[in-house]
């Protein structure tokens, strides 16, 4: 993909996207999406449906790069990535940051999971995890920022675990995520 093509890229969702006012829950079909990740070869597109069937998927939404709790979460997940691979899972991190900021964050902090850019917040909305107003008490009134959340998607594309945190400093229960993966 050329830089010009990348700059014109708009993330896509399938037309069967569920009501975005409700969070996706266990038993729901995972909404498909295509997002950008920055690799050593340049920007690449990642489509969820292309990954379905190859392994189980763990989607981790975080509010934004270069923030304390998000950095802690993704560094801990990166350090324990072998555990997820043993459980036949691919872990993907999603935030609303642009892919170049995500790549700089990953390089600075040693984050090794693929980071997907939901720059227009379409996927956060499709999964029902977008804040209407993110931290207005701190004057960070940014709509669409993802709530910290975790989803386990099985090889058939069905959500088997869903956890959405209302407070941005609260981490998902990663032991529960792993317990779910052990059942798949």
PLM feature spans:
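Chalcogenol-based redox active-site neighborhoods
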Residues: 13, 18-184
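Aromatic (phenylalanine/tyrosine) cluster motif
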Residues: 6-9
